[in-house]
A protein has these predicted regions:
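Class I S-adenosyl-L-methionine
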Residues: 1-253
Length: 254
């Protein structure tokens, strides 16, 4: 299966809601060419894993609320998610519907991703997929990045592969107390993040010093790192505004 650009890693019930979902790894050929050529990773590609609700395309899933199967209770479902559903997620969904991606056993998937950098959850929360999938497919991958907003309720073993996505100082403190490394989004204009956290080196504010595949900070506990990470809210302007509205509403309701 090494000649395929993408494979289905998982097809089954969501670990969040029980509804059908599919997890698809894309960009394998590009990542493999980069690995063989020894190209500077700053200019290269990571394998992208999309976690999509089954039965309808991502745009309609969001409109109907069916995206809860892959996004859970993430606050960014309310209009502040930086992901453009009509772009990557919809394109992958349509390709999947055309039969472009073959289903791979976990053993085949592990071999296909061996030596490659993987971005876990380009869209969708990794907690929606059984942890054994990540445990198996990442066994030989070069590196990975991963984030989950479901850190309170998911399989806590996921902390080995993922950062806890946090949107407030309180969430950050709670996630750390539960044993997670944290990735905290802060409002636009914030000059600093939580204590013991570094500014994301791939962010605009840091001068885009490193690409994620070079930095490797956001790999949960897998790499033995202890630092936490923060980043100012990003994406198109109206989504940044929506994020700050949601955070303000959340604080007022506490």
């Amino acid at each position: 299966m090494t000649g395929h650009s993408g494979i289905v890693l998982y097809r089954g019930p969501s670990q969040i809601t029980g509804a059908p979902i599919v997890a698809i790894a894309t960009g394998l050929q590009a990542a493999r060419r980069q690995a063989r050529a020894g190209v500077n990773a700053k200019t290269g590609a990571m394998v992208q894993v999309y976690i999509l609700a089954g039965g309808r395309d991502p745009v309609r899933a969001h409109q109907s609320g069916a995206d809860a199967a892959v996004c859970g209770d993430c606050i960014h479902r309310q209009g502040s998610c930086y992901v453009r559903l009509d772009q990557g997620p919809l394109q992958v969904w349509r390709a999947y519907q055309r039969g472009r991606y073959r289903h791979a056993s976990l053993q085949v998937a592990r071999a296909a991703l061996a030596g490659l950098p993987v971005r876990l959850g380009t869209y969708g929360d990794p907690a929606a997929v059984p942890t054994v999938v990540w445990q198996t497919v990442f066994a030989q991958s070069a590196t990975h990045t991963g984030y989950t907003h479901q850190w309170r309720t998911c399989d806590q073993a996921l902390a080995h592969w993922c950062m806890a996505s946090c949107d407030t100082a309180d969430e950050t403190a709670q996630a750390r107390a539960a044993g997670w490394r944290t990735f905290t989004v802060v409002p636009t204009g914030a000059e600093s993040g939580p204590d013991r956290a570094i500014l994301c080196p791939a962010s605009e504010q840091a001068g885009r010093l490193l690409h994620c595949v070079d930095c490797r900070a956001c790999d949960g506990r897998a790499g033995g790192r202890t630092a936490h990470v923060w980043i100012p809210v990003h994406g198109v302007q109206h989504k940044q505004v929506r994020f700050e509205q949601l955070i303000t509403i959340g604080r007022a309701s506490c």
